[in-house]
């Protein structure tokens, strides 16, 4: 039986729409997921289409947006690609990789996407919704929209917002960010651009990120309710930076949480950075201060440098070379510097990058084979097929411990025999997952394909202690709460803050 015929049998979905990008949809959905879980419901997150290079890999090897994975954690369930059936991964120049149900199926321009991919995209969304309900008949979907639901030039091709809301007859909440100003115009303008049948789906309004005394907005609340005839179901206070950023823009603007830093970490801000959630565990370390490196400079003030993942490794390596950052990194390594490269960062630390199929940002034949930074004797070739999988392994360095994480990459990395005099060692028992090299003057150069490596508490703590030892700082022997437990604690705090100020009763009937 088709899902449409069974909609009267399912629990009414809750959909969170926003007046703009960055209004707070992702965190609102995350909070609602945990609130409903705590109330004994079976929430499941859903976002029909997401555009992000911050990805997660589920246990079937399917790619999905990290924000939906985080929402699944809030629900107490394993992430699955059907929670985000369409993922678009920007590659620059208005080109994106298209991922359906976790699998890469090609690339497209923005113009061609709306022309050629709309119908198959809608079918994938409906297929995912049907699968979720068949496997979880008692669940309540908590759905996230994207951007604004009333982009009038795109609304007839919008797969993520009102089309999904109408299909499921969802109870919708409209979220707006008062921190940015202009909430009255945003709310009224958004509602006025909706058709009458769409506006009827909006059952509540949330004012997000309110600073100061909430009672000072009482007159504003009454005005909105009188003007729209829709209740303001929540005025959420401004929450500090301890909650996860929603997208890459938020991340770059985010300040380090450390109040008493003993270790200073520099992360290279690549133009095509991906999987920035890799650094969340470091953000939550009390003794670590993180700074983003955007331009050429003397790097000696940093205790270690991270080269993050990249969606366009060739393009980003050319940026590093042209900007002078490649030389800065090489100079840093000669001065007892410690460096960690993750995925694309690992590849760039090698000697050679070859892109025969133009998969990683090479624009012409002269860019198909370029030099890497040259700190590890490794060469990488990018192939058409992408490897996506969950990882369970054991580390050899800097400690022996169980390791979990995931891989997402096209490149295959092997030892560069011409540079084999640069001795390297495997980091893991699965030797193709990462390598490290100790400098003669001190410091280590390490690279791994494992995203989420810093989520492994023992590995992270041993690496940090390696850095501390190089600074003659005492070893941290604390058996601290694990990062994954801390992530749950952060989600609980988020949900508790929302629950204090959000009335969901009318949405649970």
Swiss-Prot record:
Active-site positions on this chain: 343 (nucleophile), 451
Ranges for domain GATase cobBQ-type: 262-459
Pfam family, any one: GATase_3
Keywords on record: Cobalamin biosynthesis, Glutamine amidotransferase
Source domain of life: Bacteria
Pathway(s) the chain acts in: Cofactor biosynthesis; adenosylcobalamin biosynthesis
Name of the protein: Cobyric acid synthase
Organism: Prochlorococcus marinus (strain MIT 9301)
Lineage: Bacteria, Bacillati, Cyanobacteriota, Cyanophyceae, Synechococcales
Gene: cobQ
């Amino acid at each position: 039986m088709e899902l449409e015929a069974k909609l009267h049998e399912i629990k009414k979905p809750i959909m969170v729409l926003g007046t703009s990008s960055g209004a707070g949809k992702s965190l609102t959905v995350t909070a609602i997921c945990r609130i409903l879980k705590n109330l004994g419901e079976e929430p499941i997150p859903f976002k029909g289409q997401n555009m992000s290079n911050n990805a997660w890999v589920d246990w079937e090897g399917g790619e999905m947006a990290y924000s939906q994975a985080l929402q699944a954690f809030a629900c107490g369930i394993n992430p699955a690609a059907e929670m985000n059936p369409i993922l678009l991964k920007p590659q620059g120049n208005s080109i994106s990789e298209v991922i359906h149900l976790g699998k890469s199926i090609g690339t497209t321009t923005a113009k061609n996407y709306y022309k050629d991919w709309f119908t198959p995209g809608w079918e994938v969304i409906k297929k995912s919704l049907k699968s979720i309900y068949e496997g979880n008949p008692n669940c309540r979907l908590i759905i996230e929209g994207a951007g604004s639901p009333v982009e009038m030039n795109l609304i007839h091709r919008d797969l993520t917002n009102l089309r999904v809301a109408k299909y499921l007859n969802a109870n919708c909440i409209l979220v707006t960010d008062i921190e940015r100003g202009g909430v009255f115009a945003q709310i009224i303008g958004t509602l006025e651009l909706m058709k009458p049948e769409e506006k009827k789906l909006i059952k509540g309004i949330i004012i997000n990120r309110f600073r100061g005394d909430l009672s000072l907005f009482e007159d504003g609340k009454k005005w909105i309710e009188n003007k729209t005839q829709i209740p303001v179901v929540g005025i959420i206070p401004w929450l500090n930076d301890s909650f996860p950023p929603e997208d890459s823009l938020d991340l770059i603007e985010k300040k380090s949480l450390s109040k008493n830093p003993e270790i200073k970490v520099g992360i290279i801000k690549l133009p095509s950075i991906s999987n920035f959630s890799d650094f969340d565990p470091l953000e939550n370390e009390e003794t670590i201060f993180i700074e983003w490196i955007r331009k050429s400079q003397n790097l000696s003030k940093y205790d270690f440098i991270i080269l993050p993942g990249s969606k366009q490794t060739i393009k980003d390596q050319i940026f590093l070379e042209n900007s002078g950052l490649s030389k800065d990194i090489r100079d840093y390594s000669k001065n007892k510097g410690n460096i960690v490269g993750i995925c694309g960062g690992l590849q760039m630390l090698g000697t050679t990058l070859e892109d025969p199929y133009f998969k990683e940002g090479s624009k012409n034949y002269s860019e198909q084979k370029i030099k890497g930074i040259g700190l590890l004797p490794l060469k990488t070739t990018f192939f058409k097929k992408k490897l996506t999988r969950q990882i369970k392994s054991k580390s050899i360095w800097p400690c022996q411990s169980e390791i979990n994480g995931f891989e997402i990459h096209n490149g295959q990395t092997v030892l560069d025999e011409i540079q084999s005099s640069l001795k390297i060692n495997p980091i893991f028992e699965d030797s193709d997952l990462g390598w490290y090299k100790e400098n003669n003057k001190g410091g280590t150069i390490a690279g791994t394909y494992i995203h989420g490596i810093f989520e492994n508490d023992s590995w992270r703590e041993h690496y940090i202690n390696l850095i501390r030892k190089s600074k003659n700082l005492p070893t941290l022997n604390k058996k601290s709460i694990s990062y994954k437990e801390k992530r749950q604690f952060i989600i609980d705090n988020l949900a508790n803050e929302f629950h204090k100020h959000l009335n969901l009763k009318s949405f649970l009937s």
